[in-house]
Amino acid sequence: MTQEVAPPAAAQDDAHGTAEHIAEGVAAETAEHAKGGLPQLNPDTYPTQIFWLAVTFGLLLFLMSKVALPRVAEVLEARQEKIADDLDRAGALKAEADAVIENYERELAEARAKAQKVLSDATLAAESETTQRLGELAADLAERARAAEARIEQARRAALGNIRGVAAETAVAAAAKLAGLDLDPATAEAAVEEALNRVRQEVV
């Protein structure tokens, strides 16, 4: 059977000291909790907290005024300048577009006026040429009608002359053959002319 060996006296002293330290730490923490809980809620630390809060707020305000706010102001100013530039450019483009539209409308009106004038001139020229051609055609037809009437009258007179001669010869021959009369050709022509005049009067 193994015999137990007793621990040395020094080891016993160290273990006793460690236990005392642990007990002191626990007691101190317990006292701290009992004193006020969280440190930031301890009224004894309020002055220090307020001081550092003021310092921190001042630093933040300084940094904002020197760094952040100027940058924001620069951004806003640049944006305002860009908006103003865009508005100016839009106004210039609108004015240019209005000028182009006005020029286009003016040229369109001029083109319409020119086209209307050309059409009117062409219509007048066509009417004048048509009137002239109709006049020339009417004159030509009248001249042809007069020439035809002259030819008809000439043919009628020639036919009447031939009829008078033939009728006179026929009358002389008939009188000599039927009645045994010897008629003078001049007398026969006079009788035929008188008969033709009576026929004309009856026809008229």
UniProtKB/Swiss-Prot annotation:
It is found in: Cell inner membrane. The keyword Cell inner membrane applies. The chain crosses the membrane at residues 50-70. It holds the Pfam family ATP-synt_B. InterPro entries: ATP_synth_b/b'su_bac/chlpt (IPR002146), ATP_synthase_B_chain (IPR050059). Signal peptide: none annotated. Keywords: ATP synthesis, Cell inner membrane, Cell membrane, CF(0), Hydrogen ion transport, Ion transport, Membrane, Transmembrane, Transmembrane helix, Transport. The keyword Cell inner membrane applies. Its main location: membrane. It is a single-pass membrane protein. GO terms for cellular component: plasma membrane; proton-transporting ATP synthase complex. It comes from the Bacteria. GO terms for molecular function: proton-transporting ATP synthase activity, rotational mechanism; proton-transporting ATPase activity, rotational mechanism. HAMAP family: ATP_synth_b_bprime. F(1)F(0) ATP synthase produces ATP from ADP in the presence of a proton or sodium gradient. F-type ATPases consist of two structural domains, F(1) containing the extramembraneous catalytic core and F(0) containing the membrane proton channel, linked together by a central stalk and a peripheral stalk. During catalysis, ATP synthesis in the catalytic domain of F(1) is coupled via a rotary mechanism of the central stalk subunits to proton translocation. Component of the F(0) channel, it forms part of the peripheral stalk, linking F(1) to F(0). The b'-subunit is a diverged and duplicated form of b found in plants and photosynthetic bacteria. F-type ATPases have 2 components, F(1) - the catalytic core - and F(0) - the membrane proton channel. F(1) has five subunits: alpha(3), beta(3), gamma(1), delta(1), epsilon(1). F(0) has three main subunits: a(1), b(2) and c(10-14). The alpha and beta chains form an alternating ring which encloses part of the gamma chain. F(1) is attached to F(0) by a central stalk formed by the gamma and epsilon chains, while a peripheral stalk is formed by the delta and b chains. PANTHER family: ATP SYNTHASE SUBUNIT B, ATP SYNTHASE SUBUNIT B', CHLOROPLASTIC. Belongs to the ATPase B chain family. This is ATP synthase subunit b 2. It comes from Rhodospirillum centenum (strain ATCC 51521 / SW). The gene is atpF2.
